[in-house]
Amino acid sequence: ALMADKTFNLQIISPTRVLFDEAVDMVEMKTTEGEIGVLAGHIPLTTILEPGVLRIKTDGNVREAALHDGFVQIQKDKVTVLAESCEWPDEIDANRAEKAKERAERRLTSGSKEVDMVRAELALKKALIRIDLAGKH
């Protein structure tokens, strides 16, 4: 029964809106250091997030969101994710993501300046995350 109290407040905020603000059991995300799973009482930490899938677990339910760049601030009983952009699977337009993937691949094969390569690779990574997530739901 004690474990039941082990929730914490998770807030996911993007520049345009608050996507999520409720009590959760666990959140998993991808940081520059690798995947982390945060439970209640985690040590305070502020770290940069990589583009990836953010997984929220509450009462055995799992919700996933595609997160693109941002950072997370972990406090004793609260976790705040500030994301450049974050989308729920049902908001992801799979066709748009496919097109973005094609565009990114074209840019990668055209092989222009270095800077563009990095940007194109990132765009490709984002598109693939979106396609992956949209395909699962």
Report the location of each language-model feature.
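Compact, glycine-rich, soluble single-domain proteins
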Residues: 9-103
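A general secondary-structure signal for short beta-strands and their flanking turns/coil
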Residues: 5-7
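Short, Lys/Arg-enriched N-terminal segments with co-localized hydrophobic residues
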Residues: 1-3
